[in-house]
Amino acid sequence: MTEHDHLTARLRGRGVDVDAAEAALRSLVIETPSWGYGDSGTRFGVFPQAGRPRTVFERVDDAAEVHRLTGTAGAVALHFPWDAVGDVQELADYITAAGLRVGAVNPNLFQDPDYVLGSVTNPDPAIRSKAESHLLECIEIARTLGSTAQSLWLADGTNYPGQDHLIERRERMIDSLTRVYAALPAEQEYLVEYKLFEPAFYATDLADWGSALLVCRRLGERARVLVDMGHHAQGVNVEQIVSILASEDRLGGFHFNNRKYADDDLIVGSVNPFELFLVFCELVGSGGPLPRLTIDQSHNIEAKVEAMVMSVVNIQDACARALIVDRAALRAASADGDVLAGHQVLLDAYNTDVRPLSASARRALGAADDPVAALRASGRAERVAAERGDAR
């Protein structure tokens, strides 16, 4: 018997519908970010890598390779103006030809020097108007690309008490976003992301899930909260936030990454895999369709394509563990008030080696049993480095 045979026999003995679990794994759609394939770094410096993509088209090529190896990374999220081209339709056609589709479109309201005091919260109405124009432009770009979501993260905030009026900033933001939301076509949703701090260090205008949720309620039904795993204070119970937003039908999606201290953008599941498992327990347990699953990471010292492949595999395995949780036993333990029995149900699933299950799902999709090993054995990194040139 194979490892997969042994695992499925054990799981079926526990009452797990293995076929349904594998079908759910095959149906995963994970968006990888175009910006995650290019040069990135910290405020201390950037370490260029040989073979780094020089254009958005090469970033799409890298995303297509991740999808080929993993089978479930069939969407690529884009960032504008980072991914701007002269002909948006040409980019759309290239993405389709690569076997991908466009995920969320991410506007950039944090790099232009005009936004030093904020974008849609800026005291200057001319700068707010400039920010709105970019947001409206991204809606049209998304329409051409076939994207169904705008993913908004605002860096807006203040560094010192007294710098600006906190409530007036909030009202400026809602006023601008209301106009932008009104221009949103029916096929697009608005994902509103929050972050506790950075680059603002005194007050961030969208600092937590509550402030983001309140803005979404002001905007409309197609405005939902996007949860970035690294945008919380230390020790925050992210899975509880997920469960509340999902129950309110306001969970729009995720930016998956991992953290040790702040917004570290490490490989998802690398530092705290149990947290990732618990998040998927809430998602799978809700019984509804999964929200948008996007990776948002900054690979500063690691090989970028390999890091992205590992990230997708970690998400697949976390989802697989959540799918084999004995829900009946969990509910029974809860009803009986048996604290540790319920905890043990989750530990049983978490400690199960689900890699054969994930590999079987990938195999059915024509992907690799072991994507990281397959990538390393392929020699692609060396070929691409030779084609694209040295980093220096």
Can you describe what each PLM-predicted range is?
Residues 1-36, 45-47, 64, 148, ...:
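Histidine-acidic metal/acid-base catalytic patches
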Residues 10-24, 101-102, 114-220, 345-348:
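Active-site acidic/histidine proton-transfer and metal-coordination neighborhood
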Residues 23-32, 36, 49-82:
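Catalytic domains of carbohydrate-active enzymes, especially glycoside hydrolases
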Residues 27-47, 108-122, 154-160:
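N-terminal small/glycine-rich loop or linker at the start of catalytic domains
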Residues 27-37, 80-110:
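Glycine-rich, aromatic-flanked loop segments that form ligand/cofactor-binding clefts
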Residues 35-37, 79-83, 107-112, 155-157, ...:
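Active-site beta-loop-alpha junctions enriched in small/polar residues
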Residues 49-66, 132-140, 235-244:
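Short, acidic/polar
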Residues 75-77, 104, 151, 255:
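Conserved beta-strand positions in the central sheet of alpha/beta enzyme cores
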